[in-house]
Structure formats: structure tokens, C-alpha cells
Amino acid sequence: MTNDRLAQDLKCIVKEWTDARILRENDIFVVGCSTSEVAGQPIGTAGSEEIASTIYQQLQSLQNATGINLAFQCCEHLNRAIVVERTIATTYSLPEVTAIPVREAGGAMAAYAYQHMIDPVVVEKITAEAGMDIGETMIGMHLKHVAVPLKFKQRFINYARVRAARTRPKLVGGSRAYYGK
């Protein structure tokens, strides 16, 4: 795998997100990522700070273009806790948990995010408006109801499958309800 290929795959996905125009300023965007899967290895076996760095940089460009708030999911060893900026935890009254993600417990991506955010904290859970799962890390528990899968053309980042989702409000009221557009 070359860093150029990885960056190109990510740029394609970032472009698809921005072209879709579904992300709004201040939306929470959850990212689950196995850098091992990106490298073509089984999840949890070959975490890579270099891969995490490239992914983080490209996601920052998505953040800059859309105004979203990034949230990074840790691995199952930290119960899929979430790394966010302290301002997000405070704004949404998210209780902080006592853990610092590292490559071996939390995962390389969450550890990298924790090391490079301005004032990071780890929270137990979050309810995001959208998200991206790189390498089948199971982000569904952190998405608002109702999750709507997005079918982007770019389906892989190197070897890792990518799944993207947005959310929509529940439709309530039954057959008499009017939902507009």
C-alpha cells in the first residue's frame, strides 16, 4: 500500500460526502476505523499510526469543508467509547470516562485522534447525525435513529470496506400524517 493510494481513496470519499451536501455545520460525524483492515490485515492485528495520520488529515479536510464535529470510535477493548473534543462533550452533556486510547486498547485511529485533538476526552457513547465505518468496526450503536445507508462509489479505502450512513428523523403519525417533501 502506498500513502498516495490511501490519500487518493480518502479524497474520493471526502468529495462524495461534500458533493452529497447532507452534512450540516455542527453535525456529529462518527468514525470507526481499523487501520489493520486498511493495511489488509485482520482487525486488531496491525494498527498503524502512519495510516491513522493520513486518515485523520483527510477527515480534517471534510471537517473544514462542512463544519462537522469529528468523533472517533475506540475498539471493543474500550467498549467502543468515543474520542471527542471537550467542547463537544460539554455541549451535549456527555459524561467523560477514564481511559486514554492506545494502539493496543482503543485502536490506532482513536489513539491518533486523542493525541492530535486540541482538548480530547473519551465519552461512553454519542448519537451522531452521520458516520463512516472503515473496516467493519460497527459504528451503528453511535448513530441516531433512523440510519440511512449511503451508496458511495468509493467502497474501499485500500483493503478496508467502507460503509457510510446519514440519519433522518423518525416518521410518526401513521397514514394521516403529512411529511412534506
Curated annotation (Swiss-Prot):
Superkingdom assignment: Bacteria
Family, similarity comment: Belongs to the UPF0340 family.
A Pfam family matched in the record: DUF436
InterPro entries the UniProt entry points to: Antibiotic_NAT-like (IPR028345), DUF436 (IPR006340)
Protein name: UPF0340 protein OB2986
